Curated annotation (Swiss-Prot):
Organism of derivation: Staphylococcus aureus (strain NCTC 8325 / PS 47)
Protein known as: Energy-coupling factor transporter ATP-binding protein EcfA1
The UniProt record lists the keyword RNA-binding: no
InterPro entries: AAA+_ATPase, ABC_transporter-like_ATP-bd, ABC_transporter-like_CS, ABC_transpr_CbiO/EcfA_su, ECF_ABC_transporter_ATP-bd, EcfA_1, P-loop_NTPase
Main function: ATP-binding (A) component of a common energy-coupling factor (ECF) ABC-transporter complex. Unlike classic ABC transporters this ECF transporter provides the energy necessary to transport a number of different substrates.
Gene: ecfA1
The entry's keywords: ATP-binding, Cell membrane, Membrane, Nucleotide-binding, Translocase, Transport
Lineage: Bacteria, Bacillati, Bacillota, Bacilli, Bacillales
Amino acid sequence: MEDKNSVIVFKNVSFQYQSDASFTLKDVSFNIPKGQWTSIVGHNGSGKSTIAKLMIGIEKVKSGEIFYNNQAITDDNFEKLRKDIGIVFQNPDNQFVGSIVKYDVAFGLENHAVPYDEMHRRVSEALKQVDMLERADYEPNALSGGQKQRVAIASVLALNPSVIILDEATSMLDPDARQNLLDLVRKVKSEHNITIISITHDLSEAMEADHVIVMNKGTVYKEGTATEIFDNAEELTRIGLDLPFPIKINQMLGHQTSFLTYEGLVDQL
């Protein structure tokens, strides 16, 4: 399979948890464009988080194939590919493994047997990129939720990944911390040409993406640009998704355009 523009490809993927009678994913196919921000959205139980687990090897497909840079992912090559894909989870407390910030960032490097001098350099650079270098010696209980997520991103960046997955990474943050984290991820994506995959139930987060995949009942419901996805907002509310605030206001005002960012709403008003 040859697709130079896609970093990850799902081809007819189905998955079923052992405890479930029905399939969580049913014949799912999509491409993740290289160097872009893709949001995979859906309500609870839509299959979106299972997709993240399959991408990083926590779970394995029952049928179908997953490709990474045109190479089919198998048991034989997965560990080699895995270091290219980093993930930031929902709860920052559950992913903090070091006693202080710099040890947490160094943890993954130690597992990959990175030499000490190189490790020290990478830890410092990664913390500097996320504006946490001054807190390198802090304990996790001295950090806010947003700061812990910054450390989680630094831990991923230190490994020089090609792809970063955010699995509901902003859902436990207050609005300001959430926006700050998204701004940071956008900056990291731009500076390092990293592919971002955001797994979320929050459609306002999808508004910032280059590419959006909407999941519903284990299948791909819609796929396209943010403008294309929000062009028919009724299709999104029909499957239980909550529309972003600016789009709701735009509808209330009777404007024709469905897709509207916060900045666009201000201009309209």
